[in-house]
Amino acid sequence: MAIETVASTDAFKVLVAEVTAQEGYREPMAFGIARVDRGQKNAEKVLQANFPLINWKENFGSAAVFIKALQEAKCDVDFSGSEFVATINDNFVANAMAAFAPYLAEATGDSHKNVQVIKTLAKMEDIGKNFRIVFLFEDANPESVEAVYLKLYALSLRKAELRKVNLNGAFGILSNVAWVGNTPYELDYLRENEIEMKLNGTYPTVDSVDKFPRFLQHVIPDDNTRILEASKVRMGAQLAAGTTVMPGASYINFNAGTLGPVMVEGRISSSAIVGAGSDVGGGASILGVLSGTDGNPISIGENTLLGANSVTGLPLGDGCIVDAGITILAGTKIKIAPEELEKIKAANPDAKLDNKTTFKGEELQGLNGIHYRQNSLTGEIIARRSTREVKLNEDLH
């Protein structure tokens, strides 16, 4: 059987209702069609998934059409697991085209992007084995490369919030590959063919060896976002409009990023988030959950300055400053003069701070308007009420 050409939008709604009413049907939380890159040695191994479009808690009518098109193409869709992945074929595309018939003419620009995907596939003579569709029915641990990539896309496209996507086990699913431009190569393939490739001049220029691709290999940033070195941002990072990532010591890991215009000249580790208007100075490090924070994810507030080569392993509020070269961790002993403590309390009326002069860093986490410094005579870390406004150059963001 096949889907008969749908004549109207009302008929389309009827089709969707029929599909979603079938026994056991589950509405996916996310889905998309990807072109996959397979291993040069092992063609069954998927190395990368390129999604021209992902759907995240949206476009459920298109999901129903894709499920029906799979079923009519003799593919049994399994709704029982947390995800379902299948290779699509020309029969699937023909069925989807028939279902989307009322929308084909108007599927241009920003309209009906899922229909545009199907229209593009329909123009290809033979889609072969390299196009896969994935449905996520719940945010469980990913089980496939396609599912990992769909979630990374959701983060980098700002469809999902940072720290709110389950990526447990992703490292074990992705292969460590040599990246040549946007093409992944199996390392074993390069080893086995090294002699021939080097002698005949076909050995590729390897840009990196990693399990994750670069952000710019998959995502087009906002017009006012600048990334001066592609290697500085990993796929799965999330960059708000107006973010500038300078060359040198900067780096943004997956599941980390910015919430507004931010100057990034330092390192934002996995799970770390930086608020709008903040400045991560040259070589400054914001620790991730695996690098010294005891599993406590670090959020940096708005209009906060992290000085060059500083290390921050403590959540900071708005309007804070960490001086260059110092380290602020949960266990760091911090001296606060009585008069400065009163000013900090005034800026943070909900904070419960004891009247003492020595605090552990964790007692100050998330507080606003604190300037962390080091006494150059004693070496003590001190804190005082910040009196300096942190403001980015609007022309640069």
UniProtKB/Swiss-Prot annotation:
Location (main, coarse): cytoplasm
UniProt-listed InterPro entries: Hexapep, THDPS_M, THDPS_M_sf, Trimer_LpxA-like_sf, Type2_DapD
Any Pfam family: THDPS_N
GO biological process assignments: diaminopimelate biosynthetic process; lysine biosynthetic process via diaminopimelate
GO MF terms, alphabetically ordered: 2,3,4,5-tetrahydropyridine-2,6-dicarboxylate N-succinyltransferase activity
Keyword Transferase: yes
Disulfide bonds: none
Pathway in which this enzyme or protein is active: Amino-acid biosynthesis; L-lysine biosynthesis via DAP pathway; LL-2,6-diaminopimelate from (S)-tetrahydrodipicolinate (succinylase route): step 1/3
Residues forming the catalytic site: 265 (acyl-anhydride intermediate)
Keywords: Acyltransferase, Amino-acid biosynthesis, Cytoplasm, Diaminopimelate biosynthesis, Lysine biosynthesis, Transferase
EC nos: 2.3.1.117
Recorded catalytic activity of this chain's protein: (S)-2,3,4,5-tetrahydrodipicolinate + succinyl-CoA + H2O = (S)-2-succinylamino-6-oxoheptanedioate + CoA
Keyword Cytoplasm: yes
Binding site for succinyl-CoA: 267, 282, 285, 308, 323-324, 331, 360, 373-376
Compartments where located: Cytoplasm
Gene Ontology, cellular component aspect: cytoplasm
Role, per record: Catalyzes the conversion of the cyclic tetrahydrodipicolinate (THDP) into the acyclic N-succinyl-L-2-amino-6-oxopimelate using succinyl-CoA.
Oligomeric form and interacting partners: Homotrimer.
Family statement drawn from the similarity comment of this UniProt entry: Belongs to the type 2 tetrahydrodipicolinate N-succinyltransferase family.
Protein name: 2,3,4,5-tetrahydropyridine-2,6-dicarboxylate N-succinyltransferase
Biological classification of the source: Bacteria, Pseudomonadati, Campylobacterota, Epsilonproteobacteria, Campylobacterales
